[in-house]
Amino acid sequence: MKAFPKNYNFTENEKKWQRIWQEKQIYAYDPNISKEETYIVDTPPPTVSGQLHIGHVYSYTQTDFIVRFQRMIGKNIFYPMGFDDNGLPTERLVEKQKQIKAYNIGRNKFIQICEEVVASEEEKFRGLLNKIALSVDWSLEYQTISPLSQKISQMSFLDLVKRGEIYRNDQPILWDPVDGTALAQADIKDTENSSLMNYITFKTEQGEPLTIATTRPELLPACVAVFYHPDDRHYKHLAGKFVITPLFKDKVPLLADPLVQQDKGTGLVMCCTFGDQTDITWWKTHNLPLKTIITKKGTIDFPNDIGIDRLKIKEARAKIIDILKEQNLLIKQEEITHIVKCAERSGSPLEILTMPQWFVKTISHKEALLKRANELNWHPKNMKIRLENWINAISWDWCISRQRCFGVPFPVWYSKRVGEEGKILYADIAQLPVDPLRDLPIGYSRDEVEPDLDVMDTWATSSVSPQLSTHGISDDFAINKNRHDKLFPMDLRPQAHEIIRTWAFYTILKAHLHQNTLPWKNIMVSGWCLAEDRSKMSKSKGNVLVPEKLLEQYGSDVIRYWSANSKLGADTAYSEDVMKNGKRLVNKLWNAAKFVSIHLHKLKDQDKKAKLLEVKEIITNEFDKWMINKLVELVNAVTNELQNYEYANAMHLTEKFFLAVFCDNYLEISKTRAYDEDNKNLSGQYSSILTLYHVMQTLLKLFAPFMPHITEELYQILYNDKESIHIKGTFANHDNLHYNIDTKQAEGMLKILDIVRKFKAEKNLSIKAPIKLLKISGIVLSEELAEDLKNVTSAEEIKFEIQDNKIKIDIII
């Protein structure tokens, strides 16, 4: 055994072991092992959109607990790390960091700067993820913007085109005027805004005044109809008539439709193209004309005498209201709060514009996707309802076109040849990856085609994150079909709950469309990390925790301990108290191991090398046997919890056993036998030391998935093993090990010890204070247990009296 160091220096040791683990490649995936023996993880690729925060550490380490356990029970592990480094989030980071805009410096220059920023940020990400001891195989790393990922993403696009699941259409889409791009339904958030409900006078052709309430009077030039509910008796007489819009004098039909809310406003609603999704429905259902007045920049495009042309939306609204007031057409205004659809990232209110975009069919697959959600194993189970609610709420097909620069291009051109103008030309699979701005379709020259200038939604690539690692999409579209078949579907998708509607949903959708399957067997959903006061962390509040500072203060194992104390899926507040508990646990492990180390030289080498089951008969003491039985129960319970992804329960059971059973009781009770300074009980001494040896070894293995550095250090010191504690097949397994003993005896002794300890505490006596006599009734302990009790309580004499079955004690000091 190595000499036991005086103190544990977590800073030095964590760096040391991280280096050794990488050098020895103990986390390497073996492609020669079968899929059945491999545990395959679809690791969340962190978005390169800013600094990694404590929430990332929180969720990534929770995944690592499960992965390390699976490796230790003998599984070959496929655990990659990726970086989601394309799309709007990354562009926004670059624009903020470099104080530039893509449209000011040109597409190519902007992409070059994005690539430079991404490379720098990813190096920082790697450093932090290594510091928190993620057991990923870095040789499997991928970037969503790499040529390989672009090829796979474009293969996904072409496969879905071939299957008829992707289409291009000129139809209404959600538009973010700040970021200048189309968005999908999942990219929006409902924001409560204060606004004014404006009651405006319209007139029928016959001159009958009608009042219509609207929050968006600037859309009056785009009004194409006025609607009322077919059951509304106030307006039934208007059927078939026309109304004249104020200011702009347009003649529009009065129509009945059941979607009108009779109790909202006046019961009359103007339909404009477009103010909301109901407008789109009415426009389609009633075959109404299209009037487009809002530009991509969020300004009005409507030259007229009113003077709203080129004004921003809010400016045009104010101008229209002023004119309505001047002409006595504004009856009243009411202050209201209502929900406005905004872009999740820019926060800008969205507009609905009509333009050609690419869409993935989604609405037609809702029923099938609900079935998929039910087939998936959810951890925790209550997260499934979030996906079900989202699927039920879907009302748009997935728009995957983005009018940005730094993303995966569509492998598409549009023909300019005479006779086939506008024909869509797709890249050949052998050409991928392609950039239509640089490359050409087979058989066409530059002047014969128009490239598709858009890039794909970043989720269009992230949604094939399993396939970015497997290198295949389907039977017809695969770079390495054998690799793909060996890795897909995967075993686990870990992710946060707020992206169930995006990442989880889109990945399930793609796998369903490509191969009629789920992408993984299990999904493990983490909660949020909150500030200590349980508020959401934000830079504006100044309560964001920087992982590097916490690592410097506490070390990786303590942070991982804090993460392990949170149940899966629960939102958890950062806690200094839990961190301090973790620090105490590290120290306690160190000190317990130091005590064990003192005695190990007394063991025979052959007994050290043997498995616990093989030395079962050498453990002769009754309390040692009880301890081994309890240890086996613990191993079985912890194994069961980890197999069910309940890492918090596993950690709690292990910690409780270590502190309460092993440290507080077993170490104290067996200590005298272990030392045996008078050589009175050599077999009892050997039994206790062998028990200490194996219990400590097992506990280190149970703690190893959670606290990898301290367990590795102690494992190497105590057991001088040439192999890491973290390699495949090292988890504790004591099957078929059990001693047939009367457990009531040992448990009775512990009850007596507890009573004695409380007595000494109440009398302010030292725990080692001598006792003249212990008179015990209700139980008669065996000679071995009585001797252990005598030693641990410092009792000179113990007398047993049988009176009844209830344990009672008289203590004479």
UniProtKB/Swiss-Prot annotation:
- Per the Swiss-Prot or TrEMBL record, what residue ranges does the short sequence motif 'KMSKS' region cover? 536-540
The UniProt entry's GO biological process terms, in alphabetical order, are: valyl-tRNA aminoacylation
What do the Gene Ontology cellular component annotations say? cytosol
Q: Which reaction does it catalyse?
A: tRNA(Val) + L-valine + ATP = L-valyl-tRNA(Val) + AMP + diphosphate
| Recorded superkingdom | Bacteria
Enzyme Commission identifier(s): 6.1.1.9
- Name the CDD domains for this protein: Anticodon_Ia_Val
**PROSITE patterns named in the record:** AA_TRNA_LIGASE_I
Example GO molecular function term?
ATP binding
Query: Position of motif 'HIGH' region?
Result: 46-56
Write down the Pfam families for this protein, in alphabetical order: Anticodon_1, tRNA-synt_1
Record keywords, A-Z: Aminoacyl-tRNA synthetase, ATP-binding, Cytoplasm, Ligase, Nucleotide-binding, Protein biosynthesis
Which ranges of the sequence are coiled-coil?
Answer: none
Q: Does the keyword Aminoacyl-tRNA synthetase apply?
A: yes
| Entry-linked InterPro entries | aa-tRNA-synth_I_CS (IPR001412), aa-tRNA-synth_Ia (IPR002300), Anticodon_Ia_Val (IPR033705), M/V/L/I-tRNA-synth_anticd-bd (IPR013155), Rossmann-like_a/b/a_fold (IPR014729), tRNAsynth_Ia_anticodon-bd (IPR009080), Val/Leu/Ile-tRNA-synth_edit (IPR009008), Valine-tRNA_ligase_type_2 (IPR022874)
Q: Which residues bind ATP?
A: K539
Entry text on domains: ValRS has two distinct active sites: one for aminoacylation and one for editing. The misactivated threonine is translocated from the active site to the editing site.
Family statement: Belongs to the class-I aminoacyl-tRNA synthetase family. ValS type 2 subfamily.
Q: What does this protein do?
A: Catalyzes the attachment of valine to tRNA(Val). As ValRS can inadvertently accommodate and process structurally similar amino acids such as threonine, to avoid such errors, it has a 'posttransfer' editing activity that hydrolyzes mischarged Thr-tRNA(Val) in a tRNA-dependent manner.
Which PANTHER family is this protein grouped with? VALINE--TRNA LIGASE, CHLOROPLASTIC_MITOCHONDRIAL 2, VALYL-TRNA SYNTHETASES
**What is the protein named?**
Valine--tRNA ligase
This protein's species is Rickettsia canadensis (strain McKiel)
- The gene behind this protein is valS
